[in-house]
Amino acid sequence: MTKVGLRIDVDTLRGTREGVPRLLETLHRHGVQASFFFSVGPDNMGRHLWRLIKPRFLWKMLRSNAASLYGWDILLAGTAWPGKNIGNANAGIIRETATYHETGLHAWDHHAWQTHSGHWSIRQLEEDIARGITALEAIIGKPVTCSAAAGWRADGRVVRAKEPFNLRYNSDCRGTTLFRPLLMPGQTGTPQIPVTLPTWDEVIGPAVQAQSFNTWIISRMLQDKGTPVYTIHAEVEGIVHQPLFEDLLVRARDAGITFCPLGELLPTSPESLPLGQIVRGHIPGREGWLGCQQAASAS
């Protein structure tokens, strides 16, 4: 049996309102639990449109057929009008999710984090994280114990900024296996659970066709030599590609794969995890930098 952590990122108002309820129903039908990470502040995702001038981002949008994949309401959110507050508008849906699934913070403002966190000060990072955690805790009525950086925009500064919040784990980077981030010699931070597998929008196109994606990603899960963690998005697998995701659950079960919340991947003694650090890097299919796992020594 292969155990795969299932991470569900919720970036937008529409993803929360439409995608999450469908995912909850789908997961319930198949007896699967996952980790949901919510953006709870303003939906300004449409402001990413300026990135179309960058060739790699434009190619990604064309390759994934973004207009039909996400919908124009997502692609234009927060452009000609102020972005609506996701948490306030969908508190009931978020509370229901937290009743049945592990629930953590993705971002206060996904667009702001993805665009500006790379040059924010530690204080600005802490204030933004605190704003998101406070809002999410007010909605779900219990402490937030985990987080996942929006767009995997994380580095050593982000690791340090999250330490005051006493989270059980963070999932802020891409990598191969769980690790303890090294803050300074002799001091480690909150365990990191990296995403190890590509997302739909990173690979779909000439190399992998939509109709063969599930076969391809299941093969990658079974071949993963680390701790497999797979990310889906409420805006994609919860809406236009919900049937594809349901098919994935069936095929994965038949292949001996069990999905679980990320928290279930943590060992009883996190001190046993190897040391590592998060550095800025790049991966195929994703425009811009993101946090990547790198080995570190205690010396």
Curated annotation (Swiss-Prot):
The keyword Calcium does not apply. PROSITE patterns: NODB. This is Probable 4-deoxy-4-formamido-L-arabinose-phosphoundecaprenol deformylase ArnD. It is an enzyme of class 3 (hydrolase). Catalyzes the deformylation of 4-deoxy-4-formamido-L-arabinose-phosphoundecaprenol to 4-amino-4-deoxy-L-arabinose-phosphoundecaprenol. The modified arabinose is attached to lipid A and is required for resistance to polymyxin and cationic antimicrobial peptides. Pathway: Glycolipid biosynthesis; 4-amino-4-deoxy-alpha-L-arabinose undecaprenyl phosphate biosynthesis; 4-amino-4-deoxy-alpha-L-arabinose undecaprenyl phosphate from UDP-4-deoxy-4-formamido-beta-L-arabinose and undecaprenyl phosphate: step 2/2; Bacterial outer membrane biogenesis; lipopolysaccharide biosynthesis. GO terms for molecular function: hydrolase activity, acting on carbon-nitrogen (but not peptide) bonds, in linear amides. Belongs to the polysaccharide deacetylase family. ArnD deformylase subfamily. One of its GO terms (biological process) is 4-amino-4-deoxy-alpha-L-arabinopyranosyl undecaprenyl phosphate biosynthetic process. Keywords: Antibiotic resistance, Hydrolase, Lipid A biosynthesis, Lipid biosynthesis, Lipid metabolism, Lipopolysaccharide biosynthesis. The gene is arnD. It catalyses: 4-deoxy-4-formamido-alpha-L-arabinopyranosyl di-trans,octa-cis-undecaprenyl phosphate + H2O = 4-amino-4-deoxy-alpha-L-arabinopyranosyl di-trans,octa-cis-undecaprenyl phosphate + formate. Residues 2-260 form the NodB homology domain. Its EC number is 3.5.1.n3. It holds the Pfam family Polysacc_deac_1. The keyword Lipid metabolism applies. SUPFAM superfamilies: Glycoside hydrolase/deacetylase (SSF88713). One of its GO terms (cellular component) is membrane. Disulfide bonds: none annotated.
